């Protein structure tokens, strides 16, 4: 993608025009080009460009596109420091004013650069910061497949990869994109190895709390396979996660009674935890039993007789369980329930089901062939 220039003249004259323009707006900058060359001129222009950011959007974009077009002429080794300086200016400008303009300017820079240029990492991180500051994360590309490709294209170090994913996660959380944020955090934690998993303690802890707090998250067994989460084994946070993965409501109640201060310190609300654990317990019951009596539900879920119907309705709304109420016989009839964990047993059940379908389809095929022969 080409970036529009400020004016169709030589690079030296273009730099001089930019200097003159900035000086006319009150910048402390000489109108004469530096003897050090274009990269020195650009360093001084970028340092003084704050004054133009208060002008009309079209004027600012024209000036900044001119700066960008000159930046892209430079050798890659001379670009990096200047691009970092420009990005810092746009991220920090007036404590968040004119976010849409700054997003546009950063986007022009990002898409104007060669797709494999490593310094695009700096520009993309700046885009994330500005978008997060104004709740506009939906206006920049954040698809995980694309981010993975960029990480590969830019040949990022492990540290930069973790920084980018952590920054993206926090931005998505701030912008209320909980599903996307969870996927990014899992990607981040999954990128650690046994050698450096201990460095991700904070991220792993945050991931668990965020998942438990999410009102739309009910399946957590995949978190236990992540190396940074495994590193937390033996700690209360890991014990709590294990309860939400496979234990019943009674186990959570006992844990809460023994660790109330810990639950409160995580920012988790006990009543919300109880509601989620009731659903998770019911899901487990529904997998094992196609019919569940009201009395059993009252005992296992610790609810009153008058609350059973409302609970079932709420459970069905989550689409984790499909069932109907039989008021006459005081029971719930289950048609389907999502497994809380998916291990070897579930894979075997899936294999058996698919194999049965295959055999039935072969029978249908053979029947149709025999009919066609006649």
Curated annotation (Swiss-Prot):
Q: What molecular function does GO assign, one term?
A: translation initiation factor binding
Keywords carried by this UniProt record: Acetylation, Cytoplasm, Host-virus interaction, Initiation factor, Phosphoprotein, Protein biosynthesis
List the residue ranges of the region (Interaction with HSV-1 and HSV-2). Answer: 344-374
Question: What result is annotated for mutating residue 361 to P?
Answer: Reduces HSV binding and entry
Q: Known SMART domains for this protein?
A: PINT
N-acetylserine modification, residue list:
2
GO terms under biological process: cytoplasmic translational initiation; formation of cytoplasmic translation initiation complex; translational initiation
Q: Where in the cell is it found?
A: Cytoplasm
| Modification sites for N6-acetyllysine | 254
Task: Indicate the principal place this protein occupies in or around the cell.
Answer: cytoplasm
Q: What does this protein do?
A: Component of the eukaryotic translation initiation factor 3 (eIF-3) complex, which is required for several steps in the initiation of protein synthesis. The eIF-3 complex associates with the 40S ribosome and facilitates the recruitment of eIF-1, eIF-1A, eIF-2:GTP:methionyl-tRNAi and eIF-5 to form the 43S pre-initiation complex (43S PIC). The eIF-3 complex stimulates mRNA recruitment to the 43S PIC and scanning of the mRNA for AUG recognition.
Task: Tell me what this protein is called.
Answer: Eukaryotic translation initiation factor 3 subunit M
């Amino acid at each position: 993608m080409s970036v529009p220039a400020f004016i169709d003249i030589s690079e030296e004259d273009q730099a001089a025009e930019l200097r003159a323009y900035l000086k006319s707006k009150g910048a402390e900058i000489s109108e004469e080009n530096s003897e050090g060359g274009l990269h020195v001129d650009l360093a001084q222009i970028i340092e003084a460009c704050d004054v133009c950011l208060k002008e009309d959007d079209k004027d600012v974009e024209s000036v900044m596109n001119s700066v960008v077009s000159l930046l892209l002429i430079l050798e890659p080794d001379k670009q990096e420091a200047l691009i970092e300086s420009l990005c810092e200016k746009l991220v920090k400008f007036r404590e968040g004013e004119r976010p849409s303009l700054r997003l546009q300017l950063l986007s022009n820079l990002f898409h104007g650069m060669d797709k494999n240029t490593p310094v695009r990492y700096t520009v993309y991180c700046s885009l994330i910061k500005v978008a997060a500051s104004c709740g506009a994360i939906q206006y920049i590309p954040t698809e995980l497949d694309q981010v993975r490709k960029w990480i590969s294209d830019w040949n990022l170090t492990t540290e930069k990869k973790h920084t980018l994913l952590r920054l993206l996660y926090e931005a998505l959380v701030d912008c209320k994109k909980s599903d996307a944020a969870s996927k990014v955090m899992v990607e981040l934690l999954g990128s650690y190895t046994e050698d450096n998993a201990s460095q991700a303690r904070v991220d792993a802890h945050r991931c668990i709390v965020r998942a438990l707090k999410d009102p739309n998250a009910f399946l957590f067994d995949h978190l236990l396979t992540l190396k940074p989460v495994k590193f937390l084994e033996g700690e209360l946070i890991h014990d709590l996660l294990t309860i939400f993965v496979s234990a019943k409501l009674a186990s959570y109640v006992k844990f809460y009674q023994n660790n109330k201060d810990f639950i409160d310190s995580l920012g988790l609300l006990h009543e919300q935890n109880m509601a989620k654990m009731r659903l998770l317990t019911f899901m487990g019951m529904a997998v094992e039993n196609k019919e569940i009596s009201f009395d059993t539900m009252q005992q296992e879920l610790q609810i009153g007789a008058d609350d059973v119907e409302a609970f079932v309705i709420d459970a069905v709304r989550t689409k984790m369980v499909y069932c109907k109420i039989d008021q006459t016989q005081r029971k719930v009839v289950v048609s389907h329930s999502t497994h809380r964990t998916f291990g070897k047993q579930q894979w075997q059940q899936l294999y058996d089901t698919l194999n049965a379908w295959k055999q039935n389809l072969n029978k249908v095929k053979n029947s149709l062939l025999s009919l066609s022969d006649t």
